[in-house]
Amino acid sequence: MNPAQIVLFGSTFCVMIAVHFSMKLISEHVLNWKKPKEQKAIIIIIMMAPLYAVDSYVGLINFFGSETFFTFLDSIKECYEALVIAKFLALMYSYLNISLSKNIVPDEIKGREIHHSFPMTLFQPHTTRLDHHTLKLLKYWTWQFVVLRPMCSILMITLQYLEVYPSWINWTITIILNVSVSLALYSLVVFYHVFAKELEPHKPLSKFLCIKGIVFFCFWQGIVLDLMATMGIIRSRHSWLSVERIEEGYQNILVCVEMVFFSIYQTYAYSAAPYSANNKSNVLSDKKSK
Protein backbone atom coordinates (compact mmCIF):
# COMPACT_ATOMS: atom_id res chain seq x y z
CA MET A 1 0.00 0.00 0.00
CA ASN A 2 1.28 3.46 -0.88
CA PRO A 3 1.05 6.38 1.62
CA ALA A 4 -2.10 7.78 -0.02
CA GLN A 5 -3.90 4.45 0.32
CA ILE A 6 -2.80 4.11 3.96
CA VAL A 7 -4.13 7.61 4.74
CA LEU A 8 -7.43 6.89 3.00
CA PHE A 9 -7.80 3.52 4.74
CA GLY A 10 -7.01 5.05 8.15
CA SER A 11 -9.43 7.93 7.57
CA THR A 12 -12.14 5.48 6.49
CA PHE A 13 -11.65 3.51 9.71
CA CYS A 14 -11.81 6.70 11.82
CA VAL A 15 -15.02 7.85 10.15
CA MET A 16 -16.62 4.43 10.68
CA ILE A 17 -15.69 4.48 14.39
CA ALA A 18 -17.01 8.05 14.85
CA VAL A 19 -20.28 7.20 13.10
CA HIS A 20 -20.62 3.95 15.09
CA PHE A 21 -20.31 5.58 18.53
CA SER A 22 -22.57 8.48 17.54
CA MET A 23 -25.30 6.28 16.06
CA LYS A 24 -25.13 3.98 19.08
CA LEU A 25 -25.63 6.93 21.42
CA ILE A 26 -28.48 8.31 19.32
CA SER A 27 -30.21 4.91 19.32
CA GLU A 28 -29.94 4.80 23.13
CA HIS A 29 -31.71 8.15 23.34
CA VAL A 30 -34.41 7.02 20.91
CA LEU A 31 -34.99 3.83 22.90
CA ASN A 32 -35.28 5.90 26.10
CA TRP A 33 -37.39 8.70 24.64
CA LYS A 34 -38.63 10.41 27.82
CA LYS A 35 -38.13 14.16 27.25
CA PRO A 36 -38.45 14.98 23.53
CA LYS A 37 -37.60 18.67 23.91
CA GLU A 38 -34.26 17.92 25.56
CA GLN A 39 -33.38 14.81 23.58
CA LYS A 40 -34.08 16.39 20.18
CA ALA A 41 -31.48 19.05 21.00
CA ILE A 42 -29.06 16.39 22.29
CA ILE A 43 -29.37 14.31 19.11
CA ILE A 44 -28.63 17.35 16.93
CA ILE A 45 -25.53 18.04 19.06
CA ILE A 46 -24.40 14.39 18.92
CA MET A 47 -24.61 14.50 15.10
CA MET A 48 -21.90 17.16 15.02
CA ALA A 49 -18.96 14.72 15.32
CA PRO A 50 -20.04 12.24 12.60
CA LEU A 51 -21.06 15.06 10.27
CA TYR A 52 -17.63 16.70 10.64
CA ALA A 53 -15.96 13.33 10.05
CA VAL A 54 -18.00 12.45 6.95
CA ASP A 55 -17.67 15.99 5.56
CA SER A 56 -13.88 15.89 5.93
CA TYR A 57 -13.77 12.38 4.45
CA VAL A 58 -15.63 13.58 1.34
CA GLY A 59 -12.99 16.29 1.03
CA LEU A 60 -10.27 13.62 1.09
CA ILE A 61 -11.97 11.46 -1.53
CA ASN A 62 -12.52 14.41 -3.86
CA PHE A 63 -9.03 15.79 -3.18
CA PHE A 64 -8.81 17.67 -6.48
CA GLY A 65 -12.20 19.34 -6.29
CA SER A 66 -12.69 23.02 -7.05
CA GLU A 67 -12.14 25.81 -4.53
CA THR A 68 -15.90 26.39 -4.47
CA PHE A 69 -16.43 22.71 -3.62
CA PHE A 70 -14.13 22.91 -0.59
CA THR A 71 -15.72 26.17 0.54
CA PHE A 72 -19.09 24.41 0.31
CA LEU A 73 -17.81 21.52 2.47
CA ASP A 74 -16.42 23.92 5.08
CA SER A 75 -19.69 25.84 5.06
CA ILE A 76 -21.67 22.67 5.84
CA LYS A 77 -19.56 22.08 8.96
CA GLU A 78 -19.63 25.68 10.10
CA CYS A 79 -23.36 26.19 9.50
CA TYR A 80 -24.06 23.03 11.48
CA GLU A 81 -21.78 24.38 14.20
CA ALA A 82 -24.06 27.44 14.39
CA LEU A 83 -27.10 25.17 14.70
CA VAL A 84 -25.41 23.16 17.46
CA ILE A 85 -24.60 26.30 19.47
CA ALA A 86 -28.25 27.38 19.22
CA LYS A 87 -29.46 23.92 20.26
CA PHE A 88 -27.05 23.84 23.20
CA LEU A 89 -28.54 27.09 24.50
CA ALA A 90 -32.03 25.66 23.96
CA LEU A 91 -30.99 22.56 25.93
CA MET A 92 -29.79 24.68 28.85
CA TYR A 93 -33.07 26.63 28.78
CA SER A 94 -34.96 23.35 28.81
CA TYR A 95 -33.01 22.09 31.84
CA LEU A 96 -33.87 25.31 33.67
CA ASN A 97 -37.48 25.31 32.44
CA ILE A 98 -37.02 28.79 30.98
CA SER A 99 -38.89 29.80 27.83
CA LEU A 100 -36.64 30.92 24.94
CA SER A 101 -39.35 33.23 23.66
CA LYS A 102 -40.49 34.74 26.96
CA ASN A 103 -37.03 35.09 28.59
CA ILE A 104 -38.65 35.01 32.02
CA VAL A 105 -36.09 35.00 34.83
CA PRO A 106 -37.11 32.87 37.84
CA ASP A 107 -37.44 34.97 41.01
CA GLU A 108 -34.91 32.86 42.95
CA ILE A 109 -32.07 33.77 40.55
CA LYS A 110 -33.12 37.26 39.52
CA GLY A 111 -30.48 39.82 40.43
CA ARG A 112 -27.49 37.47 40.33
CA GLU A 113 -24.23 39.13 39.39
CA ILE A 114 -22.72 38.67 35.94
CA HIS A 115 -19.00 39.45 35.74
CA HIS A 116 -17.78 40.33 32.26
CA SER A 117 -14.14 39.94 31.24
CA PHE A 118 -11.99 41.79 28.72
CA PRO A 119 -12.65 42.69 25.89
CA MET A 120 -16.38 42.55 26.67
CA THR A 121 -15.84 45.18 29.38
CA LEU A 122 -15.18 47.68 26.57
CA PHE A 123 -18.88 47.46 25.67
CA GLN A 124 -20.52 46.25 28.89
CA PRO A 125 -20.14 47.14 32.59
CA HIS A 126 -17.74 44.87 34.45
CA THR A 127 -20.59 43.74 36.72
CA THR A 128 -24.27 43.57 35.81
CA ARG A 129 -27.34 42.00 37.38
CA LEU A 130 -29.34 39.18 35.82
CA ASP A 131 -32.74 40.34 34.64
CA HIS A 132 -35.03 40.02 31.62
CA HIS A 133 -32.82 42.34 29.55
CA THR A 134 -29.50 40.57 30.23
CA LEU A 135 -31.04 37.14 29.59
CA LYS A 136 -32.35 38.38 26.25
CA LEU A 137 -28.92 39.88 25.47
CA LEU A 138 -27.20 36.53 26.06
CA LYS A 139 -29.67 34.90 23.68
CA TYR A 140 -29.02 37.54 20.99
CA TRP A 141 -25.26 37.15 21.36
CA THR A 142 -25.67 33.45 20.65
CA TRP A 143 -28.15 33.77 17.82
CA GLN A 144 -26.21 36.42 15.90
CA PHE A 145 -23.75 33.67 14.89
CA VAL A 146 -26.60 31.34 13.90
CA VAL A 147 -27.82 34.00 11.44
CA LEU A 148 -24.45 35.39 10.33
CA ARG A 149 -22.72 32.06 9.57
CA PRO A 150 -25.10 30.89 6.77
CA MET A 151 -25.20 34.40 5.28
CA CYS A 152 -21.40 34.54 5.06
CA SER A 153 -21.28 31.02 3.60
CA ILE A 154 -23.72 31.92 0.83
CA LEU A 155 -21.72 35.09 0.11
CA MET A 156 -18.40 33.20 -0.04
CA ILE A 157 -19.72 30.45 -2.32
CA THR A 158 -21.38 33.00 -4.64
CA LEU A 159 -18.24 35.15 -4.93
CA GLN A 160 -16.05 32.12 -5.60
CA TYR A 161 -18.46 30.82 -8.23
CA LEU A 162 -18.37 34.24 -9.93
CA GLU A 163 -14.55 34.23 -9.56
CA VAL A 164 -14.67 37.52 -7.67
CA TYR A 165 -12.98 36.52 -4.42
CA PRO A 166 -9.82 38.49 -3.59
CA SER A 167 -7.84 37.51 -0.50
CA TRP A 168 -8.88 40.62 1.45
CA ILE A 169 -12.55 39.54 1.26
CA ASN A 170 -11.60 36.09 2.53
CA TRP A 171 -9.69 37.57 5.49
CA THR A 172 -12.48 40.07 6.24
CA ILE A 173 -15.15 37.35 6.35
CA THR A 174 -12.85 35.11 8.42
CA ILE A 175 -12.29 37.86 11.01
CA ILE A 176 -16.02 38.68 11.17
CA LEU A 177 -16.92 35.02 11.69
CA ASN A 178 -14.23 34.49 14.33
CA VAL A 179 -15.49 37.48 16.31
CA SER A 180 -19.05 36.23 15.86
CA VAL A 181 -18.40 32.65 17.06
CA SER A 182 -16.25 33.95 19.94
CA LEU A 183 -19.15 36.14 21.10
CA ALA A 184 -21.57 33.20 20.84
CA LEU A 185 -19.30 30.90 22.86
CA TYR A 186 -18.65 33.68 25.38
CA SER A 187 -22.40 34.11 25.95
CA LEU A 188 -22.70 30.37 26.62
CA VAL A 189 -19.88 30.56 29.18
CA VAL A 190 -21.58 33.49 30.94
CA PHE A 191 -24.88 31.61 30.88
CA TYR A 192 -23.20 28.58 32.45
CA HIS A 193 -21.60 30.61 35.26
CA VAL A 194 -24.89 32.32 36.10
CA PHE A 195 -26.83 29.04 36.30
CA ALA A 196 -23.97 26.75 37.41
CA LYS A 197 -25.73 25.61 40.59
CA GLU A 198 -29.02 24.75 38.85
CA LEU A 199 -27.30 23.08 35.89
CA GLU A 200 -24.84 21.02 37.96
CA PRO A 201 -26.90 17.76 37.90
CA HIS A 202 -26.89 17.86 34.08
CA LYS A 203 -23.07 18.02 33.67
CA PRO A 204 -23.21 21.20 31.54
CA LEU A 205 -19.43 21.74 31.56
CA SER A 206 -18.66 18.41 29.89
CA LYS A 207 -21.43 19.06 27.36
CA PHE A 208 -20.07 22.52 26.57
CA LEU A 209 -16.45 21.32 26.36
CA CYS A 210 -17.49 18.72 23.82
CA ILE A 211 -18.83 21.43 21.50
CA LYS A 212 -16.08 23.94 22.21
CA GLY A 213 -13.41 21.26 21.75
CA ILE A 214 -14.58 20.48 18.22
CA VAL A 215 -14.77 24.18 17.33
CA PHE A 216 -11.42 24.91 19.03
CA PHE A 217 -9.45 22.12 17.36
CA CYS A 218 -10.87 22.72 13.88
CA PHE A 219 -10.20 26.45 14.06
CA TRP A 220 -6.75 26.54 15.65
CA GLN A 221 -5.28 23.65 13.72
CA GLY A 222 -6.41 25.49 10.57
CA ILE A 223 -4.50 28.57 11.76
CA VAL A 224 -1.40 26.46 12.54
CA LEU A 225 -1.54 24.79 9.12
CA ASP A 226 -1.86 28.22 7.47
CA LEU A 227 1.24 29.43 9.33
CA MET A 228 3.16 26.27 8.43
CA ALA A 229 2.29 26.78 4.76
CA THR A 230 3.32 30.45 4.94
CA MET A 231 6.64 29.53 6.60
CA GLY A 232 7.32 26.91 3.93
CA ILE A 233 7.09 23.94 6.31
CA ILE A 234 4.19 22.61 4.26
CA ARG A 235 5.21 22.69 0.62
CA SER A 236 4.33 21.05 -2.66
CA ARG A 237 6.86 18.99 -4.59
CA HIS A 238 4.68 18.75 -7.68
CA SER A 239 3.59 21.51 -10.07
CA TRP A 240 0.09 19.99 -10.33
CA LEU A 241 -0.45 19.97 -6.54
CA SER A 242 -0.97 23.28 -4.74
CA VAL A 243 0.05 23.98 -1.15
CA GLU A 244 -3.57 24.87 -0.39
CA ARG A 245 -4.68 21.38 -1.40
CA ILE A 246 -2.04 19.77 0.83
CA GLU A 247 -3.08 22.01 3.72
CA GLU A 248 -6.74 21.11 3.14
CA GLY A 249 -5.80 17.43 3.10
CA TYR A 250 -3.97 17.64 6.42
CA GLN A 251 -6.93 19.45 7.96
CA ASN A 252 -9.37 16.79 6.76
CA ILE A 253 -7.19 13.93 8.03
CA LEU A 254 -6.86 15.54 11.47
CA VAL A 255 -10.61 16.15 11.71
CA CYS A 256 -11.37 12.50 10.83
CA VAL A 257 -9.05 11.34 13.64
CA GLU A 258 -10.24 13.90 16.21
CA MET A 259 -13.92 13.08 15.69
CA VAL A 260 -13.24 9.53 16.92
CA PHE A 261 -12.22 10.91 20.33
CA PHE A 262 -15.09 13.40 20.45
CA SER A 263 -17.66 10.75 19.49
CA ILE A 264 -16.37 8.60 22.37
CA TYR A 265 -16.38 11.57 24.78
CA GLN A 266 -19.98 12.33 23.79
CA THR A 267 -21.09 8.96 25.17
CA TYR A 268 -20.22 10.37 28.61
CA ALA A 269 -21.23 14.01 28.13
CA TYR A 270 -24.57 13.25 26.46
CA SER A 271 -25.30 9.87 27.99
CA ALA A 272 -28.84 8.51 27.71
CA ALA A 273 -28.62 7.14 31.27
CA PRO A 274 -30.60 10.03 32.86
CA TYR A 275 -33.52 9.14 30.59
CA SER A 276 -33.35 5.41 31.21
CA ALA A 277 -36.40 3.79 32.80
CA ASN A 278 -34.05 2.08 35.26
CA ASN A 279 -32.37 5.30 36.35
CA LYS A 280 -33.20 5.78 40.04
CA SER A 281 -32.09 9.39 40.25
CA ASN A 282 -34.45 10.23 37.40
CA VAL A 283 -37.33 8.59 39.23
CA LEU A 284 -36.53 10.41 42.46
CA SER A 285 -36.33 13.77 40.71
CA ASP A 286 -39.71 13.12 39.08
CA LYS A 287 -41.22 12.36 42.50
CA LYS A 288 -39.80 15.56 43.95
CA SER A 289 -41.17 17.63 41.09
CA LYS A 290 -44.60 16.12 41.67
Q: Which sequence ranges carry the predicted segments?
A:
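Multipass alpha-helical transmembrane domains of eukaryotic endomembrane proteins
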Residues: 36, 111-237
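Non-transmembrane, juxtamembrane loop and terminal tail segments
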Residues: 102-127, 275-290
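Hydrophobic alpha-helical segments at protein termini of multi-pass membrane proteins
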Residues: 4-21, 167-171, 198-199, 241-248, ...
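C-terminal transmembrane module of eukaryotic multi-pass membrane proteins
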Residues: 193, 197-290
